[in-house]
Amino acid sequence: MFLAQEIIRKKRDGHPLTEEEIRFFINGVRDNTVSEGQIAALAMTIYFHDMTMPERVALTLAMRDSGTVLNWKSLNLNGPIVDKHSTGGVGDVTSLMLGPMVAACGGYVPMISGRGLGHTGGTLDKLEAIPGFDIFPDDEKFRDIIRHVGVAIIGQTNSLAPADKRFYATRDITATVDSIPLITASILGKKLAEGLDALVMDVKVGSGAFMPTYQKSEELAESIVQVANGAGCQTTALLTDMNEVLASSAGNAVEVREAVQFLTGEYRNPRLFEVTMALCVEMLVSGRLADSRQQARQKLQDVLDNGKAAEVFARMVAAQNGPTDFVENYNKYLPTAVLSKPVFAEKAGFVTEMDTRALGMSVVTLGGGRRKATDAIDYSVGLSEIAALGTEINTDTPLAMIHANSEKSWQEAAAEVRKAMVIGETKRETSPMVYRQVSE
């Protein structure tokens, strides 16, 4: 039998905690036998003293085991259970293509996603722009969709990693969110509860990233890869660029529109294509659905070219109570904003810099994102046709198309977009999309 305060004292004095001590504390978080003050104290000691790799693995597994861990054995699936997690960014709509692409190649993707907060968009919000789309199917329905379609994207239920929810809420109000061991356990506790065989982690770098520097992003990627593999899940990570909006659009309905166009081949933003492909390749290789990256890439290109990936997406939407003809008629179903008009730069030149975070916040200004978790959002608003870095701009070339619900919010967002996009004299070199791959 342990005492929470003795566990806090031990960590405060710089000693590593045992697996039993960590489990006792996390179970207490779940059962409400550990107080909010004690959670705050332990979080702060971890923030200052860090955690060894065995401690991080133990914390992650304790978070995972605080609730239900999905088990797919009874379904006798003929492929691996694989998923992707992104640290979030702006215009990061990869999940909507990646899930169907990997499923079309024989993987099973039970993706449990989140909502948007602040400048980062949320996959669930994007999907809820589709009329009728149900992000909370019951357990039987969820398993049924995975068995028959191969991919489902749903919201986190209270039964998955419940200790994390309480632990995170305390971190949020005690300035202990940005601790690498705590971020690692929070992300992986939820992801590993999906019962995965393999995971790929997309860690963003740059002005729209969650981590402030390349070094911090790299540190997080390395921590996640080591801890997830230590917990028995084949995991790699990619460090990808978020110095500009990833897709050509940012918002909810506008990003779903772009995802459908990507899957059908109507329009594929080259940067979005590169990142999505790179992540899918990792998933196929880690899940042993391909012998090499080259073979994986070919398989993925094939399911895009022959329409299988688009078909899987259509079946997922229908299975989750969306329209059965959504892919063919997405424009009919997706909400459109009252006002759509372009914003222009005040001078000619090249787009040399982009404050991606500020562009994400302009979507919040329009009503398409949240400042706090309880905010309602307008699915129709956002930005589209965003000029990429290096684009030559004159006073007739728009920086972006702004979709707003009033002239006032259009004007506010236009000012933010102009400020966020720097126009310079010379064309800058574009940065790579994938900086490096992190594996064990």
Swiss-Prot record:
EC number: 2.4.2.4
PANTHER family to which the protein is assigned, alphabetical: THYMIDINE PHOSPHORYLASE (PTHR10515:SF0)
Family stated for the protein in its record: Belongs to the thymidine/pyrimidine-nucleoside phosphorylase family.
GO cellular component: cytosol
Gene: deoA
Stored InterPro entries: Glycosyl_Trfase_fam3 (IPR000312), Glycosyl_Trfase_fam3_N_dom (IPR017459), Glycosyl_Trfase_fam3_N_dom_sf (IPR036320), Nuc_phospho_transferase (IPR035902), PYNP-like_C_sf (IPR036566), PYNP_C (IPR013102), Pyrmidine_PPas_bac/euk (IPR018090), Pyrmidine_PPase_CS (IPR017872)
Signal peptide: none
Name the record gives this protein: Thymidine phosphorylase
Catalytic activity: thymidine + phosphate = 2-deoxy-alpha-D-ribose 1-phosphate + thymine
One Pfam family named in its UniProt record: Glycos_trans_3N
UniProt subunit comment: Homodimer.
Molecular-function GO terms, alphabetical: 1,4-alpha-oligoglucan phosphorylase activity; thymidine phosphorylase activity
Function field: The enzymes which catalyze the reversible phosphorolysis of pyrimidine nucleosides are involved in the degradation of these compounds and in their utilization as carbon and energy sources, or in the rescue of pyrimidine bases for nucleotide synthesis.
